[in-house]
C-alpha cells in the first residue's frame, strides 16, 4: 500500500534508489545533485542497501567506472549536473554505443559561462545527441516515479541503452513537496533482478567490450544503436502501462493539459509546466482556448506523436530553457518545427528562450505569450519566430 510523505526531489530519487538497490554507484559530487550520492552512501552505511559505492576523482571517472561495472554485469547508476555531465561527454558516447543500460540521475543546472549554479536545461540538451534516453520530470513525484521506471525501460529487450532521469536543479531537487511512495517490495518486484544478456564475467560466453571498429563495420553498429533508441519509445509506453497498475499514476511520451479544443498551445519541458498550467487555468476561466503540452520523453524524440497532438491548434509556443547558439532557435524549437513540417502540419510556431541560469518564469509571462500568439493569428501582428522572454 502506498504511503504519503514529504520529500525534496533529491530525496525522492535517493529513496527510489534505496528501493531498487542497484549493484554499483560510482559518483563525484557536484551541486545541485550532491545530495543524491550523499543520501545513497548513508543508506549503504546504515545497512539498508548493499550497493557498492565507488568514490572517484571526477565525473569522467564516475562514468568510466559505471561503464566498467555495467560491462561486468552489474546494475549501475550515477548522478551529476552541469559541468559534471560535460566532463563525462566522451564516456556518455561510449556507454550508449556499447548498449549499456546505466541510469543517470541528472539534476539540471546551467553550463558555464558566466559561472552560475542555477537551473536551465543546457546540460541535458547539450548531451541530447549522445545516444542516451532522456526523460524529464515536472515535480518531485515524477522524479521518483521516473527513476523507478528507468531500469525497466533501459534494460528492455531491443533497447539496452543508458537513460537519464532529469529534474530541475533547486526548483525540484531542493524544494520539498508532498509525495506518494510505493512499498519497497512493490518497487523491487516491478524493477526485477538484472539479467544482462552479455557481460564480461561470463566464462561460458567470452565477449569483447568496446573494441576498435573498422570502417567495414562501424556504420552498421551506429545504425543498430539508432534502432535501439527508436525501440525505446515503445518501451517507455509499455513500462508506463505496467507502472500504472502498481501506482495508479499515468505516464506517456508527453502530457496534454486542456489541449482538446485549444487554439493556442504552449509546449515545454520540466517544472515550468506547473506555471504554464496555472496560467492556462486562469485564461480558461476567461474563455480563452489555451492548453499545455509537457514533454516527458525528449530522447527518442516523439515527433510524429507531437505533430498529431498539435495539428488542431492555430499556433504553438515552443519553450526552450536553453540556448543552442545557432541563430535559429533552441533544441526543442528545432525538433518540433522539423517534426511538424515532415508531418505536413502547417501551423504557426514561435520559439521562446526562457529561464536561463535560474531566471524565474512567471504566470504573467505565460499570459503574455498566449496574448502574442492570439494577436498574431487574429490581427496579423508580425512575430519574431525566435525570441527571448523575461530579459531585463
Give residue ranges: language-model regions:
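Conserved thiamine diphosphate
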Residues: 118-162, 166-169, 345-359
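Glycine-rich beta-alpha junction loops
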Residues: 109-110, 167-174, 270, 323, ...
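Thiamine diphosphate
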Residues: 1-126, 131-132, 148, 389-392
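Redox- and metal-dependent alpha/beta enzyme cores, enriched for Fe-S-associated oxidoreductases
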Residues: 259-288, 301-308
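Conformationally flexible catalytic loops at phosphate/diphosphate-handling active centers
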Residues: 162-255
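Peripheral docking tails and interdomain loops at the edges
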Residues: 320-392
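Short helix-loop-beta junction
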Residues: 41-46, 278-292, 341-342
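Short acidic, glycine/serine/threonine-rich loops at helix termini
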Residues: 36-39, 65-67, 88-92, 113-119, ...
Amino acid at each position: 500500500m502506498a504511503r504519503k510523505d514529504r520529500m525534496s526531489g533529491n530525496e525522492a530519487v535517493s529513496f527510489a534508489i534505496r528501493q531498487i538497490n542497484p549493484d554499483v554507484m560510482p559518483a563525484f559530487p557536484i551541486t545541485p545533485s550532491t545530495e543524491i550520492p550523499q543520501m545513497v552512501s548513508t543508506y549503504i552505511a546504515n545497512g539498508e542497501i548493499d550497493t557498492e559505492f565507488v568514490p572517484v576523482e571526477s565525473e569522467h571517472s564516475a562514468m568510466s567506472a559505471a561503464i566498467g561495472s555495467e560491462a561486468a554485469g552489474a546494475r549501475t547508476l550515477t548522478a551529476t549536473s552541469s559541468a559534471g555531465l560535460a566532463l563525462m561527454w566522451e564516456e556518455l558516447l561510449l556507454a550508449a554505443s556499447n548498449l549499456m543500460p546505466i541510469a543517470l540521475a541528472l539534476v539540471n543546472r546551467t553550463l558555464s559561462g558566466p559561472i552560475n549554479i542555477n537551473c536551465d536545461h543546457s546540460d541535458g540538451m547539450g548531451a541530447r545527441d549522445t545516444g542516451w534516453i532522456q526523460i524529464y520530470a515536472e515535480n518531485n513525484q515524477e522524479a521518483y516515479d521516473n527513476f523507478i521506471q528507468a531500469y525497466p525501460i533501459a534494460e528492455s529487450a531491443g533497447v539496452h541503452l543508458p537513460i537519464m532521469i532529469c529534474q530541475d536543479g533547486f526548483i525540484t531537487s531542493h524544494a520539498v513537496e508532498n509525495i506518494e511512495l510505493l512499498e519497497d517490495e512493490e518497487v523491487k518486484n516491478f524493477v526485477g533482478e538484472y539479467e544482462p544478456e552479455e557481460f564480461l564475467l561470463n566464462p561460458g560466453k567470452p565477449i569483447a567490450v568496446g573494441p576498435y571498429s573498422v570502417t567495414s563495420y562501424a556504420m552498421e553498429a551506429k545504425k543498430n544503436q539508432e534502432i535501439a533508441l527508436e525501440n525505446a519509445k515503445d518501451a517507455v509506453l509499455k513500462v508506463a502501462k505496467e507502472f500504472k497498475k502498481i501506482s495508479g499514476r499515468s505516464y506517456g511520451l508527453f502530457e496534454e493539459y486542456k489541449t482538446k479544443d485549444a487554439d493556442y498551445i504552449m509546449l515545454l519541458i520540466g517544472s515550468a509546466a506547473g506555471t504554464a498550467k496555472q496560467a492556462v487555468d486562469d485564461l480558461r476561466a476567461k474563455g480563452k482556448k489555451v492548453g499545455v503540452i509537457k514533454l516527458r520523453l525528449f530522447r527518442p524524440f516523439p515527433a510524429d506523436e507531437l505533430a498529431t497532438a498539435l495539428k488542431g491548434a492555430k499556433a504553438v509556443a515552443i519553450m526552450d530553457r536553453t540556448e543552442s547558439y545557432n541563430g535559429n532557435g533552441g533544441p526543442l524549437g528545432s525538433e518540433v518545427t522539423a517534426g511538424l513540417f515532415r508531418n505536413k502540419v502547417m501551423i504557426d510556431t514561435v520559439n521562446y528562450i526562457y529561464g536561463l541560469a535560474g531566471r524565474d518564469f512567471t504566470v504573467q509571462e505565460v499570459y503574455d505569450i498566449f496574448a502574442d500568439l492570439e494577436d498574431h493569428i487574429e490581427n496579423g501582428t508580425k512575430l519574431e519566430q525566435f525570441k527571448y522572454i523575461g530579459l531585463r
